[in-house]
Each structure stands twice: as structure tokens, then as C-alpha cells.
Amino acid sequence: MLSLQRREHRQAWVLLAPMLIAMFILTAWPLARTLWLSFTDTALAGSGEATHYVWLDNYLYALTDPDFRAAFARTLYFTVVSVAIEGAIGVLVALLLNQRFVGRNVLRVLVILPWALPTIVNAMMWRLNFNPDYGSVNALLSQLGPPDSALHAVMLADIWKNYPLVTLLVLAALQSVPDDLYGAARLDGASAWRRFRAFTFPAIVGPLGVALVLRTIDAFKVFDIIYVMTRGGPLDSTKTLSFFVYQESFSYLHAGSGAAYAMLMSLMCAVLIALYLFLLLRQRRRSIDDEA
């Protein structure tokens, strides 16, 4: 007769089975199909030619393609700069909202609003703001002659949209620190920097790390805000990896090479996800050690 623990274990797998099957259908099968396509010269256009296996040729071409490498460098720049600024602004705003002042709750709601907006709405709003004819910041748009400025405009929209996520996670961590600790530190003559280093930073480092890794993954695969605002232009200056894969697959109809680009990008995202899991497990171990 099965023990109670084994019965519960089996029942848990039975309950999880529908979700696991759905995940396989929605994730594993398309991923396997994309992997297969990446080894072929499949074209979406009706050329009438049979599909041939080219094996690693698509990957070798991708690694030597200057346009792909430029898109990767552009994506890396977008990710690093955007996430760094979002982290800095998010922490500063969280520290502000953790203070006691009149209207704090109203300000908290206003801070969350950009994050609550759908990305498409946010992108369209910034596109209208940068319109050269009637945009509220058209003076800035007139300076977008240098192509690099367009990427910075997209980064501004992305930062405004996503820094509230960092603020929320850091603010939740700050509220777990008892006010008595800060009061006692002030009585002992500790400076604001020493209080931050001794109490604030240890409390927020875990949630901040998780927020930054999640934002890094999201920023690395940015697509929608670029599609709405710039369509990868001008002169491909805002063409990131996701947009590059989109164009290769659906604009140029090169399904085989597009799949190879997509698999390489998925591998890069997998590395970031592994980093997130590593930080999550390390934070959990620290919590267990602190409780012990």
C-alpha cells in the first residue's frame, strides 16, 4: 500500500500533467520546429524549390554576418544602459517613497502608472511626443538627424515604462526594515551613508538583483516598442536582435536563416535565465541560513 507521501506526490503529478502537456504543446514543439528549420534553407516565399538541409551553414553565416553582429552590439548597448538607468532611478524613487510625507500614497500610484500602461500604448505616446510637426518634444526630435539619437529616444521610452518595476520591488524590501534600526543608528551618530550601507543595501540587494535580471532578459528581447516607434530605423540604427530576426523571417521570408538567428538569440536568453535562477537560489540559501 502506498504511503501517504507517495500518494500525495503522485496526485501532484496528476494535477500538474495538463499544465505540463500544454506547456509542451505551446513551447517545446515550436522550439523543436524552429530548431529543425534552422538546419534548412526553407523560404516562406513560394519559390517552388525543395527544402534542403544545410546543417550548420545558417549558424556559421550568422556568426560572421556583420549586420547580425551590429544588431547584437546595439541590443547589448540598449540593454546595459537602459537597465542600469532603470535600476538607479528605481532605487532613488523607492528611497523617496519610503519616506513619510503628505501625498505619499498619491505619488506611489502615479509612479506605478507608466508600468501599468501597455507597451504599445507607451510606445505610441512617445512616438506622438517626438512627432516633428505637433509633438510636445519636437525640438528634441529635430536633433535626431544623427542616427544614434533615435536609439536613445527609444531607450528613454523604455526607461520611463519600466523603472517602476524596480521601484516596486525595492520599496517592498525597504518596508521590511524596522524603523527602530534607523532610529537607533541616528542616536549612535551614524551618517546617512552608513545607515544605507548597514541596513538599506543588505535589505534591497536581493530584490534589486532579481529585478535587474528580469529587466535584462526583457530588454534583451525588446521588439514591440521599436516596432511601433521606429521600425528599426533610421538607417537600421534601432534594429535590435528581435527586430533583426523578425525582418529576416517575415520581411525577407528567409525562414531557415531566421530560425538560426532566433535559436542563437534564445541561447543568449537562456544564459540570462540561468543567471536569474542562480541569483534566486543563492538568495533563498541566504534566507535559510539567516533563519537558522
Task: Describe the role of every protein-language-model region.
Residues 1-7:
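Short, Lys/Arg-rich, polar N-terminal cytosolic tail immediately upstream
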Residues 8-292:
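A structural signal for multi-pass alpha-helical bundles of membrane permease subunits
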